[in-house]
Curated annotation (Swiss-Prot):
Protein name: CTP synthase
Residues that hold L-glutamine according to the record: 54, 353, 381-384, 404, 469
Disulfide bonds: none
Domain of life: Bacteria
Gene Ontology terms, MF aspect: ATP binding; CTP synthase activity; glutaminase activity; identical protein binding; metal ion binding
Active-site residue numbers: 380 (nucleophile), 514, 516
Regulation of protein activity: Allosterically activated by GTP, when glutamine is the substrate; GTP has no effect on the reaction when ammonia is the substrate. The allosteric effector GTP functions by stabilizing the protein conformation that binds the tetrahedral intermediate(s) formed during glutamine hydrolysis. Inhibited by the product CTP, via allosteric rather than competitive inhibition.
Xref: PROSITE patterns: GATASE_TYPE_1
An individual GO BP term: pyrimidine nucleobase biosynthetic process
Gene name of the record: pyrG
Amino acid sequence: MARYVFITGGVVSSLGKGIAAAALAALLQARGYRVRIRKLDPYLNVDPGTMSPYQHGEVFVTDDGAETDLDLGHYERFTGRPANQQDNITTGRIYRNIIEKERRGDYLGATVQVIPHVTDEIKNFVLEGNEDYDFVLCEIGGTVGDIEAMPFLEAIRQLGNELPRGTAVYIHLTLMPYIPAAGELKTKPTQHSVKELRSIGIAPDILLVRADREIPESDRRKLSLFCNVRESAVIQALDVATIYDVPIAYHKEGLDSEVLSAFGIDPAPKPRMDRWEEVSHRLHNPEGEVTIAVVGKYTGLKDAYKSLIEALHHGGLANKVKVNLDWIEAEVFESEDPAPYLEKVHGILVPGGFGERGAEGKILAAKFARERKVPYFGICFGMQMACIEAARNLVGIEDASSSEFGPTREPVVGLMTEWLKGNMLEKRAAAGDLGGTMRLGAYEAVLKPDSKIAQIYGSTDIHERHRHRYEVNIDYKDRLEAAGLNFAGMSPDGVLPETVEYADHPWFIGVQYHPELKSRPFEPHPLFASFIEAAIEQSRLV
């Protein structure tokens, strides 16, 4: 039977509930337990697919094509377990399901209400499909006190009563701010947050307290007294240098032991922390460093590229180097010469994105990398812009563009309407709902045996995750290849270009998919490991 850990947050948002959940899951895994993590998001959107990156950050795509919260990326990276559509629910999906049931008559004429219908739908989501797991961790998005979160908090309160005794534990993540004028940490915000949570009917078993300095024993006793938790269950969560130090830090503070104790599991299997210690050692003891320019559209909010950032650091781990990121807004290159920005970097990465803004700047970045022989990694939109650059400057198609930017006589990049998914042909209407017109999830690609990318993968058959509406137009393939841009990877039916590369360039690869979504600290994605390796070689030339 699965045991449930419900993780809530208080005082302020962005405390790191997702990292906390992922770290705890990793610690339980290290003890040999089978763990699943689920995210409950209170917003009314059906999924984050159409939300602005500045509002939400990255949209993390799973193998089965779900557009989910970026925390699921942390879950995958920390546990190695691929997430799926059933690991993330939103208020929007809950209400959509309920309205569909009401229209079908499933409620037999009953008045549909938040309690019991909404809360029952949430509980069903939490409990479904957990037969193969020892622990299920449920992170509740938002902050205690948010009106949007009330149905979710009520649902997990009910579950605490309905589940067998001893199979549900509540962890509350809070903040102890330091007040310089007083020269001390303050417990009152945490006390009020717990009071709010208790007023809903949830009594936390464990307090995980964020702080930027050691919490005095007197403050721990104070929190224990006023929040009605054991003193040993007041766990300090101090700031650490990297997110991959969090599992080690939480283990030293006794979080995993306290959770197991709350479930009455004693003695518990000892954890194996060696691989986390190895990752931490490599991060803190690099043998060199490289600088990668990320020429993007949403550089004002780094969370928009969360998986990309982590994958680059994984590439650094594979090569035992520190990876420094130089963030460049692509629009800058539309009014300024790229050379002063790019001459000192050791690699250029143009990530995915949507829309015309910044496109010309990304094209200029691809041109600089091609002409100066600087390692270039184009992902999704970055591959498309590299193809447009080649069409303009190598093939001589001056009007080469993308139909995403408006009508064009030379659509080197165009809207997809159909593609193969396994043996089935999937179709999308261009006029359909914005959230349902993309190629989403894991798809197969076939690589040329003699290509550089096949050598990097060590295989000619790969499966990678996609999130795009537009694709390089195969009608331009022959002319681009004649000019030197090799279409090294194609969809199994040979219709959709998946990867491109230059044979005469040290490292210039574009991919239509998002390899960053499958990178792990213990298993760096081969493309990122190879890209950083090429950047190391470039660093010796700069």
